[in-house]
């Protein structure tokens, strides 16, 4: 039975400008949110060369302190050495490939593989091999833990599995470095432990929703009560930015009204930022929400084509004032409700994208962040322009990027 022609090409909106991307006004096809081969290419071309946040330098203050990040079948340890330097390694023993560290964080003078007892120091060097004589002329210096690139961006530690020539985190955030300076990232401390929240959706849906300003007034009544309709969105080459100012009009909701009341002045912030909520999203999957009272970091990591893991942790400047403690608790209550609303929305989208009836959807000119993200994905994986899924095995013939930095 022949399928009906795709109605989307006949829609009059949007009309591309001369020399513009003909797909600029359209979403990614539905099949890209559920296809295993597409995820495999995303893993190689997007996630392996992208920066991923692990922790803050204050989370590993002493020699031997470490944090672990697991994603796309890799496990990375960020660790402070006895010399005070921060390094990152693959969490894989060089003997038989066993994972070494199970804890999400901790402190250890040595890392010992639980399989055969190979031991590494805090700089990743191989220092102990049981029954070493049996390995002949084993070069200990050549069998340390595999290093992983690490970048310290104003106190936050990012890792990158592969360098494809793309920019540093500092370069990506350069347009906003003066804006965030007042928040004193280097002095932040964690308010709690890392939280992991599994979601039965494709990872892109979480990011699409995060940068979507149009749904705020429809699906988040609490944010509308707090900010009215004054929610801004912009997209730059590597970063999306969203923002809204807390209104003076008391909310009808108790937690929101209490937050408006108790939120104290932050002496380190200029007047225009005392009531401003700002959100940044770095390509491809990292976000940080900047509030006057705290800063929340979040990333969404793919598990399968229809499963993702949200990893998040809040940070703040030390402040013992009762009003600030109350504001931070109320912030959590407000955003817990927002997260519940978003969870329902993204699961609704994933369910809809499972239908063969959906190919692509038109994007408003106001959806600047989503337009930009879709364009980046199409640049990295050209098959994302296809309205229908290619035949099985299509990814094996996908043209390589020929050394082009996908993050440039």
Per-range role (PLM):
Residues 8-36, 98-114, 146-154, 228-264:
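N-terminal short leaders/motifs
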Residues 47-51, 98, 215:
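Generic structural signal for secondary-structure transition and capping sites
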């Amino acid at each position: 039975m022949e399928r009906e022609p795709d109605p989307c090409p006949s829609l009059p909106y949007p009309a591309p400008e001369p020399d513009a991307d003909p797909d600029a006004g359209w979403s990614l096809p539905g099949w890209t949110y559920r296809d295993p081969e597409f995820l495999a290419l995303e893993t190689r071309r997007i996630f392996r060369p992208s920066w991923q946040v692990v922790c803050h330098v204050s989370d590993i203050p002493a020699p031997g302190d470490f944090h672990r990040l697991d994603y796309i079948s890799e496990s990375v340890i960020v660790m402070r050495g006895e010399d005070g330097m921060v390094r990152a390694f693959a969490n894989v023993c060089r003997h038989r490939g066993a994972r070494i560290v199970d804890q999400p964080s901790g402190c250890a003078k040595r890392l010992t593989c639980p399989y055969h007892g190979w031991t590494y120091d805090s700089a990743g060097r191989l220092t102990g091999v049981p029954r070493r004589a049996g390995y002949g002329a084993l070069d200990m210096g050549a069998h340390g833990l595999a290093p992983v690139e690490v970048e310290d961006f104003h106190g936050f530690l990012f890792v990158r599995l592969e360098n494809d020539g793309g920019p540093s985190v500092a370069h990506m955030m350069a347009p906003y470095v003066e804006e965030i300076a007042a928040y004193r990232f280097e002095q932040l401390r964690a308010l709690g432990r890392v939280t992991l929240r599994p979601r039965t959706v494709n990872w892109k849906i979480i990011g699409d929703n995060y940068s979507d300003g149009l749904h705020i007034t429809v699906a988040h009544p609490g944010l509308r009560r707090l900010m009215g309709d004054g929610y801004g969105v912009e997209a730059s080459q590597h970063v999306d930015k969203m923002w809204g100012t807390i209104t003076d009009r008391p909310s009808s909701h108790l937690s929101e009204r209490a937050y408006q009341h108790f939120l104290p002045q932050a002496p380190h912030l200029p007047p225009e930022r005392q009531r401003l909520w700002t959100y940044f999203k770095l390509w491809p999957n990292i976000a940080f929400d900047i509030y006057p009272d705290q800063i929340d970091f979040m990333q969404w990591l793919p598990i399968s084509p229809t499963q993702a893991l949200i990893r998040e942790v809040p940070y703040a400047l030390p402040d013992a004032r009762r009003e600030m403690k109350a504001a931070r608790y109320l912030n959590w209550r407000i955003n817990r409700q927002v997260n519940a609303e978003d969870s329902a929305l993204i699961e609704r989208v994933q369910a809809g994208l499972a239908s063969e009836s959906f190919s692509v959807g038109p994007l408003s000119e106001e959806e600047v962040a989503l337009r930009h993200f879709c364009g980046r994905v199409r640049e990295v994986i050209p098959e994302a322009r296809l309205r229908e899924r290619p035949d099985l095995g299509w990814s094996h013939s996908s043209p390589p990027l020929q050394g082009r930095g996908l993050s440039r």
